[in-house]
């Protein structure tokens, strides 16, 4: 072989290698970065979207806050869902309600967090960034804008948070869980777990129910003190002729105190720190007593279950009351403000609800009518369309 022929063969081989490398790069699954943290209300909808996007062939990465609870939740969910979620973190936390010094330092901390997020996104090179609300989404959204990466935001609450109010101005797409919470937001609902979406509809469930009214009390995974103390006392004052069964989730730190409260009230209850399979608990119940976080309201609607809401009184912009109104206005729920509530007042309402299942079934059916089925899939549809544009 002559030298010119060898050089020609070598050049041809190099072109072939370049084509193969280029093809592999093009065919490599695209990455989607999900930004969420701070509370389960931001993280769990993000995980539902992560699963939907992964099923469509996307790699999933997660941007959270250093020291946040989301790292553990994402790792656990990743194992359960059977695919890897690359977790990265930035140094950021909320400032509202933390005093003047926190406000003064906020601009510098935000700038630092934006730079951290920018470096992470440059490394990941995602096709899309999804902000699920909470303070961690702010710097990540700003970084996505700087890098000209498409941005989708989702607002879980009926009253939009500060982060999403800012990001909405330049996001490529704004999705909302409750109608009207953000200007020009597309109403898709809150993505919920698949096992909750597949619970039998209320008409079918209530046709099979008999015996004592079953009450699910959700004090929250962290424990809502007012619910854990007031509800046992209220059940101690209801009409003794009304049969009922109670499952009460307290949060791990309030377990023993809540058990003691039921004992003092002379009421039998199954008191647990945490409910692993919430879908089964919601299916079992005739109605729930709980806070009105965005995800709780959406899960009740998805299943079709009536509720007594006791909104967290210190929620920013009173967003829990606004969340509750979504089901209260259609007759699917009753709302009682904590400051106006006592065991005696709550007992009066419980006497009404424990009197029979007819009203409870009506509430459940109305809740189901407010649901947005397959929210995670619809969310993923919008994301995929934006990526392929």
Curated annotation (Swiss-Prot):
UniProt enzyme class: transferase
InterPro entries reported in the protein's UniProt record: GlcNAc_MurG, Glyco_trans_28_C, GlycoTrans_28_N
Entry annotated with the keyword Cell cycle: yes
A Pfam family per the record: Glyco_transf_28
Major location (coarse): membrane
Keywords, sorted A to Z: Cell cycle, Cell division, Cell inner membrane, Cell membrane, Cell shape, Cell wall biogenesis/degradation, Glycosyltransferase, Membrane, Peptidoglycan synthesis, Transferase
Residue ranges that the Swiss-Prot or TrEMBL entry lists as coiled coil: none
Pathway linked to the protein: Cell wall biogenesis; peptidoglycan biosynthesis
Enzyme nomenclature, EC number: 2.4.1.227
Cellular location(s): Cell inner membrane
Gene3D superfamilies linked to this entry: Glycogen Phosphorylase B
Membrane topology classification: Peripheral membrane protein
CDD domains: GT28_MurG
GO biological process, one term: regulation of cell shape
Protein family per UniProt: Belongs to the glycosyltransferase 28 family. MurG subfamily.
Protein name (record): UDP-N-acetylglucosamine--N-acetylmuramyl-(pentapeptide) pyrophosphoryl-undecaprenol N-acetylglucosamine transferase
Taxonomic classification: Bacteria, Pseudomonadati, Pseudomonadota, Gammaproteobacteria, Cellvibrionales
Gene from which this protein is expressed: murG
């Amino acid at each position: 072989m002559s030298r010119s022929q060898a050089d020609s063969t070598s050049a041809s081989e190099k072109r072939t290698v370049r084509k193969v490398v280029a093809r592999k790069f093009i065919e490599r699954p695209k990455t989607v970065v999900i930004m969420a943290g701070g509370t389960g209300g931001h993280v769990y909808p993000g995980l539902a979207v992560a699963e939907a996007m992964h099923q469509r062939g996307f790699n999933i990465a997660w941007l959270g806050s250093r020291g946040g609870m989301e790292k553990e939740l994402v790792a656990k969910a990743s194992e359960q869902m059977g695919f890897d979620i690359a977790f990265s973190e930035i140094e950021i936390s909320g400032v509202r309600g933390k005093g003047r010094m926190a406000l003064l330092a906020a601009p510098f901390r935000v700038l630092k967090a934006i730079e951290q997020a920018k470096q992470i996104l440059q490394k990941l090179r995602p096709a899309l960034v999804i902000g699920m609300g909470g303070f961690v989404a702010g710097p990540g959204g700003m970084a996505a804008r700087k890098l000209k990466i498409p941005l989708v935001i989702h607002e879980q609450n009926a009253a939009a948070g500060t982060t999403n109010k800012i990001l909405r101005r330049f996001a490529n797409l704004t999705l909302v869980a409750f109608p009207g919470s953000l200007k020009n937001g597309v109403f898709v609902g809150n993505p919920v777990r698949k096992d909750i979406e597949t619970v039998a509809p209320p008409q079918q469930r209530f046709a099979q129910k008999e015996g004592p009214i079953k009450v699910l009390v959700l004090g929250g995974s962290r424990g809502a003190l007012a619910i854990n103390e007031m509800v046992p006392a209220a059940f101690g004052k209801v009409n003794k002729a009304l049969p009922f069964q109670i499952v009460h989730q307290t949060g791990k730190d309030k377990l023993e105190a809540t058990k003691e409260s039921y004992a003092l009230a002379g009421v039998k209850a199954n008191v647990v720190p945490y409910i692993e399979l919430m879908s089964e608990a919601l299916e079992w119940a005739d109605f729930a007593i709980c806070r009105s976080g965005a995800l709780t309201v959406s899960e009740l609607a998805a299943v079709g279950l009536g509720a007594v809401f006791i909104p967290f009184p210190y929620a920013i912009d009173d967003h829990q009351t606004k969340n509750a109104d979504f089901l209260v206005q259609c007759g699917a729920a009753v709302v009682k403000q904590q400051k106006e509530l006592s065991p005696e007042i709550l007992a009066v309402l419980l006497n009404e609800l424990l009197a029979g299942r007819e009203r409870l079934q009506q509430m459940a059916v109305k809740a189901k009518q407010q649901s947005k089925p397959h929210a995670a899939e619809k969310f993923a549809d919008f994301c995929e369309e934006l990526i392929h544009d």
